Amino acid sequence: MSNAREIRSKVQSVKNTQKITGAMELVAASKMRGTIVKMNNVRPYVESANTIIKNVTAASIDYPNPYLFDRDVKRVGYIVISTDRGLCGGLNINLFKHVLKEIKNNIEDRVGVDVCVIGSKAENFFAKLKDVNIVATAHYNDKDKEGSIRAIGGAVKVMLDKFTAGEIDRLYMSSNQFVSTIKQRPRLQTLLPIQDIFSAEEIKANKEKATKGHWDYIYERDIEEVLNALCIRYIEAQVRGAILENAACEQAARMMAMKNATDNASDIIDQLKLDYNKIRQAMITQELAEICSGAAAV
């Protein structure tokens, strides 16, 4: 009887946990939809900034903008975007494995590595690595969006200043890419030098266009200052978009993790009920046997 009572207690406990995971699944789904809307709202800004940089660069094709041209790589920087919370499956671990492979390749090639981490999970992970220098940290908090944006902007500025000063020669960003609700994958993209502005053929063509005045703006300051400011805004917008996309990945992964937990709870409840019924059946069989034995003795 004690075993049956214990099983009933376990069933009730699993049902309570199932209610919690079910509620967390619904909350994650709601947050994911809201974050996807924000993520899609950032993309037009990034695309417009890209177009303007192309036009301004075409008008000042001879200006050696430090954000646009490659140089010998002696030290690199990484901006790694993770989550602040867990319960999102293997989202962070898969990201860390992906970026760690690239970092190890750089270390083997005797290229120094500086890291800016956004999110407590990345901060805790990279703090344990001896060969990686963490130069900036930041966190994104929905409850304090303005403070989070300032903190992230400051962390990104540290990496931009390092690139401008020549302390790092290339800047990468590692984050999760939102493919679908059930699929998210790690992504590593080059932030600096900006590689998605012009190909070699476009540079040659735009130099010819610039002499004919195809692209022209009225600048309040000189064109070099405007182009530098545009490049910085472009990088900041890319990081902001990546943070929102990573947040969407987090909620999608959490939603699926909670759904799996809820489904597993149902399987556990079914198994516990089966065990309970077996115990009851054994008890009833024993009682019947005792009754029959007593009747035979009479």
From Swiss-Prot:
Alphabetical list of SUPFAM superfamilies matching this protein: ATP synthase (F1-ATPase), gamma subunit
Cited Gene3D superfamilies: 3.40.1380.10, ATP synthase, gamma subunit, helix hairpin domain
Transmembrane segments: none
Protein name: ATP synthase gamma chain
InterPro entries, alphabetized: ATP_synth_F1_ATPase_gsu, ATP_synth_F1_gsu, ATP_synth_F1_gsu_CS
Cellular component, GO, one term: plasma membrane
This protein's record includes keyword Protein biosynthesis: no
Job of this protein: Produces ATP from ADP in the presence of a proton gradient across the membrane. The gamma chain is believed to be important in regulating ATPase activity and the flow of protons through the CF(0) complex.
Any GO molecular function: proton-transporting ATP synthase activity, rotational mechanism
Subunit organization: F-type ATPases have 2 components, CF(1) - the catalytic core - and CF(0) - the membrane proton channel. CF(1) has five subunits: alpha(3), beta(3), gamma(1), delta(1), epsilon(1). CF(0) has three main subunits: a, b and c.
Disulfide bonds, paired cysteine numbers: none
CDD domains: F1-ATPase_gamma
UniProt keyword list: ATP synthesis, Cell inner membrane, Cell membrane, CF(1), Hydrogen ion transport, Ion transport, Membrane, Transport
Gene it is expressed from: atpG
An individual GO BP term: proton motive force-driven plasma membrane ATP synthesis
Species per Swiss-Prot/TrEMBL record: Francisella tularensis subsp. tularensis (strain WY96-3418)
Membrane topology listed for this record: Peripheral membrane protein
PROSITE patterns attached to this UniProt entry: ATPASE_GAMMA (PS00153)
